[in-house]
């Protein structure tokens, strides 16, 4: 009588942490670009604001260091659009937490850092898409800058979308449900007004100029002014960007750790 040999455990290759990353990237990109409300605020609103203030003879005739004022305006409005997209993408995490999607990710091979990388690359693609359309609209309607200034402005605008994503992440990890979208949009709208994104600070009440350097979007506004050649980038603007990036990233990290422990 022979004794059957014990069955060997099935050897399966360890799946790649990038398994499903491509599908997640496409889903993330399409869910935002095909959302009419997202595109209305991120694309149509900046062009409408530019049309109101930038498509004037004064804006076309006023020269900055690297172009005209109309070009600086389209770059500024585009920045607001991509920051809104970044905030929306970051706040999406809140909805995923409340619906249980984030826990479903934990059952798949894809790693959390890969999910973050996918979201960031999708944000870059979305920001580049918005920037291409709005800058083309600006060029066709009298906005003028040197080729180098257009390229530098586009790079800065796309990079600043990460600030919106950090604000959205901070809201998404600390505020439950779809309220995170409202909170993120509120922070950005108020920040845009107080930082001089829509109306220059010298045309606002004096107290606004005093608190502006401490608001989330002040550094972004100054960065656009600097790349357009209207002003030099002040030290306070660099500190503003770095400080708010650290604060929002810290809040998001704390929220992510708390969510993982739970």
Describe the role of every protein-language-model region.
Residues 2-4, 13-24, 199-238:
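Short hydrophobic, aromatic-rich alpha-helical segments embedded in or entering the lipid bilayer
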Residues 13-20, 24-99, 127, 143, ...:
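Transmembrane helix-boundary elements of multi-pass transport/secretion proteins
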Residues 31, 54-58, 139, 143, ...:
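Transmembrane helix-loop junction
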Residues 36-37, 71, 113, 178, ...:
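Residues that define the loop-to-transmembrane-helix transition and helix capping
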Residues 52-59, 174-214, 218:
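Transmembrane helix segments
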Residues 92-124:
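Helix-loop-helix units of permease transmembrane domains in multi-pass membrane transporters
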Residues 106, 110, 141, 175, ...:
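Short helix-loop-helix connector
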Residues 112-189, 232-253:
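Alpha-helical transmembrane segments and their short interhelical loops
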